[in-house]
Regions:
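Conserved AdoMet/S-adenosylmethionine-binding subsite of the radical SAM
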Residues: 88-210
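Conserved alpha-helical substructure of the radical SAM core
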Residues: 2-131, 279-292
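Short, acidic, Ser/Thr-enriched surface-loop or helix-capping motifs
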Residues: 215-218
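Processing junctions and N-termini across compartments
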Residues: 35, 39-42, 200, 263-266
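Short cysteine clusters
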Residues: 41, 45-48, 206, 224-225, ...
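C-terminal accessory region of radical SAM enzymes
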Residues: 152-197, 226-277
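A broadly conserved sequence feature marking short terminus-proximal activation segments
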Residues: 1-17, 226-241
Length: 292
């Protein structure tokens, strides 16, 4: 779903883009769900605000999340937040479970690529829909199977703060190469040292509140994928009747959406610049009406 969203932003003029983007919104249940299968990571990037822990999501909880989502038809899933998803001991079982529940579900994996050689053949056979390899500086050696993965279902994401421009050319043979700036993860890291803007200036509503909540490894549900410390936790999955559905249709999220429409953001959103990842999806008249 999010890759389609990116395509819309790149290809369509603004009014058409807004209409098309809003067609992705489902006020009954989110179209896309971020699931942190693991908090573990084998890198220590200086800019990363992740908590340094190696916990994994309980697989029974994972299945319960997928079961709930599957009641609402085809959905898309990112199986990561701040950990490396290929370090999740049950990552292949997780992928298989999603596809078994609904073959039209789509799966996105964002990986640092360090263990991709080990999983390349199984990922090709698993029906993963998209793999994003996100790197600050790309390695020079790959196995033939890894190259096949990247060519068939991969997207290479290069953070231009760290990758020399001369390296971009050699990635032109892949289906998609995305060059993007590092964002500040809810104001948790200082991106101004790379000459990037903070969240200052005219804001517009963040798409995450209408499209994609996040579930941390321990079941904590937070408003989006840019909350490394879980500071915007809204509930714990499966406890006291709390679910993705109850959050998505509840008063808390309705108030958050209204505050964004009124340009009155609070909490983690105040210093965040990730809303700039996509153009504004709403028309001015909707904001004046306090669209929810």
């Amino acid at each position: 779903m999010l890759t389609k969203f990116t395509d819309l932003a790149r290809k369509l003029p603004s009014p058409v883009y807004k209409v098309a983007a809003q067609a992705f919104i489902d006020l009954n249940f989110p179209r896309h769900i971020f699931i942190e299968t693991t908090a573990a990571c084998n890198l220590t990037c200086e800019y990363c605000p992740r908590e340094k822990r190696n916990d994994h999501m309980d697989f029974q909880m994972f299945k319960e999340i997928i079961n709930e989502c599957s009641q609402y038809g085809a959905r898309s899933f990112s199986l990561h937040l701040f950990g490396e998803p290929l370090l999740y001991p049950k990552i292949m079982e997780a992928i298989s479970y999603i596809k078994a529940k609904n073959k039209r579900h789509t799966i996105l994996l964002t990986t640092n690529g360090t263990v991709l050689n080990k999983f390349a053949r199984r990922l090709l056979e698993s029906r993963v829909d998209r793999i994003i390899w996100s790197w600050r500086r790309l390695p020079t050696e790959f196995s033939s199977e890894t190259m096949e993965v990247l060519k068939r279902i991969g997207m290479v994401r290069i953070l231009i703060e760290e990758t020399p421009k001369e390296e971009f050319e050699r990635w032109s043979k892949f289906p998609r190469v995305e060059v993007k700036h590092l964002h500040n993860y809810g104001g948790q890291i200082d991106t101004t040292k790379w000459g990037l803007e903070s969240s200052n200036g005219d804001r517009y509503p963040c798409y995450h509140l209408w499209l994609a909540p996040a579930i941390r490894w321990n079941g904590d549900v937070t408003i989006c994928c840019n909350d490394p410390k879980g500071s915007e936790r809204v509930g714990s999955y499966g406890k006291d009747g709390f679910s993705i559905g109850t959050y998505w249709t509840g008063n808390h999220l309705a108030r958050l959406r209204t505050s964004h429409m009124n340009n009155e953001v609070k909490g983690l959103c105040v210093g965040c610049n990730s809303y700039k990842a996509y153009p504004d999806i709403f028309f001015n008249f909707q904001k004046k009406d306090g669209h929810k």
